[in-house]
């Protein structure tokens, strides 16, 4: 998705009529406008703020499920999300520093935590799914804080060891050894149904998400419960 800004190039009809429509603009390349008689300077600045996060979060496809949920179910319009987040981003000076992948997730969560109408449980689960999807191995950096209680974690792994179909028929067919089970999998708290997410529906459901990382493949994920 490209967010472009009107330019008054030399020799164009619009530039010749700039005064008629109240355009103010940069008189040297790239000739971008500052304002006109219907779009004040402050609105241009707000749109500019949206540009940076649009590129990093939507066009880069780093967290498609999360952003789709936010622009569809949480914010009134996609622009409301990108503009609001973009302004928050700019106010904190993040546009002037570099960002690791993990930083992008934490910065979005930081913004959403300031809003009263956001279900952070759903958002955090979607963010983790987006974060894990391109990974072939368990990530070394654990930027998230949600953990399964130790006794619950032991019980869940014990159930999978006893009957692999607890993690689904597809996982059972992999014949994963106990060593690889512990070496290449994670279990995290979940606030949505992963089964429904695969059908492009976000359905709130408290439980656990099992992730098995496979070299060269997308991780296997499934809802599990005791």
Predicted segments, located by residue:
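A structural motif corresponding to the C-terminal lobe/cap of the Radical SAM core domain
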Residues: 1-81
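Radical SAM enzyme core and accessory elements
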Residues: 52-226
């Amino acid at each position: 998705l490209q967010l472009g800004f009107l330019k008054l190039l030399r020799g164009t009809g619009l530039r010749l009529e700039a005064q008629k429509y109240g355009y103010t603009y940069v008189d040297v390349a790239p000739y971008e406008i500052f304002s006109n008689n219907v779009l004040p300077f402050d609105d241009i600045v707000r749109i500019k703020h949206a540009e940076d996060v649009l590129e990093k979060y939507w066009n880069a496809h780093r967290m498609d499920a999360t952003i789709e949920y936010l622009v569809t179910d949480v914010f009134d319009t996609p622009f409301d999300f990108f503009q609001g987040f973009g302004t928050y981003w700019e106010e904190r000076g993040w546009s002037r520093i570099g960002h690791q992948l993990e930083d992008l997730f934490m910065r979005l969560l930081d913004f959403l935590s300031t809003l009263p109408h956001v279900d952070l449980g759903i958002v955090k689960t979607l963010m983790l799914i987006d974060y894990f999807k391109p990974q072939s191995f368990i990530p070394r950096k654990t930027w998230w804080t949600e953990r399964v209680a130790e006794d619950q974690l032991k019980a869940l792994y014990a159930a999978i060891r006893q009957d692999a179909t607890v993690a689904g028929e597809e996982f059972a067919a992999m014949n994963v050894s106990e060593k690889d089970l512990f070496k290449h999998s994670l279990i995290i708290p979940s606030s949505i149904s992963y089964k429904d997410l695969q059908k492009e529906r976000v359905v709130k459901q408290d439980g656990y998400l099992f992730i098995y990382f496979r070299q060269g493949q997308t991780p296997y994920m499934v809802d599990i419960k005791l």
